[in-house]
């Protein structure tokens, strides 16, 4: 009887200590992204004077962490995966004469982000153009 009582006490102590910690180890699909307005810069790699950096303000959140303007007409997000602090994606934009597919990753650290985007643009009757961009960004405040 005494052994059983000790094991019940041990078990209850274990659960009282473990349960509060279990949320720390639970598999979450959240990244350390502070939601709000983000200033995102895409710089072609290697940098050239022919291509100026692309700078845009985007509203990012846990549900929309991909730092690309997916709401642009003709653009859609094909896949999105989150691993640790990093979001990986594949997106596609279709316009009249060409299709651009981008494969990217962005690693968040609360108020900043770094990553890379590779684009492949194909147009009817032309060679596919491939470009690689370095992605950087900082949170600027709340979305408007």
Regions found by a protein language model. Name each.
Residues 98-103, 116-118, 129-133:
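Short, surface-exposed coil-to-beta transition loops
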Residues 123-144:
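Edge beta-strand at a domain terminus
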Residues 90-107:
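Mid-chain, well-packed structural core segment of small domains
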Residues 9-20:
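Bacterial N-terminal signal peptides
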Residues 39-76:
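Short, solvent-exposed loop/hinge segments that bridge or flank secondary-structure elements
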Residues 40-42, 88-95, 116-122:
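Short beta-strand segments that buttress and anchor functional surface loops
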Residues 1-6:
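N-terminal secretory signal peptides that target proteins for export/translocation
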Residues 24-37, 81:
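N-terminal helix-cap/turn-to-beta initiation motif at the start of protein domains
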């Amino acid at each position: 009887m005494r052994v059983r009582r000790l094991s019940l006490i041990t078990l209850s102590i274990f659960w009282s200590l473990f349960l509060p910690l279990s949320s720390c180890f639970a598999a979450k699909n959240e990244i350390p992204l502070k939601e709000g307005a983000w200033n995102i810069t895409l710089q072609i790699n290697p940098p050239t004077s022919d291509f100026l950096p692309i700078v845009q303000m985007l509203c990012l959140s846990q549900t929309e962490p991909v730092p690309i303007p997916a709401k642009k007409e003709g653009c859609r997000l094909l896949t999105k995966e989150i691993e640790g602090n990093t979001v990986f994606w594949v997106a596609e934009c279709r316009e009249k004469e060409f299709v651009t597919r981008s494969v990217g990753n962005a690693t968040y650290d609360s108020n900043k982000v770094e990553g890379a985007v590779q684009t492949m643009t194909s147009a009817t009757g032309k060679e596919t153009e491939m470009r690689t961009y370095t992605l950087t960004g900082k949170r600027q405040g709340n979305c408007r």
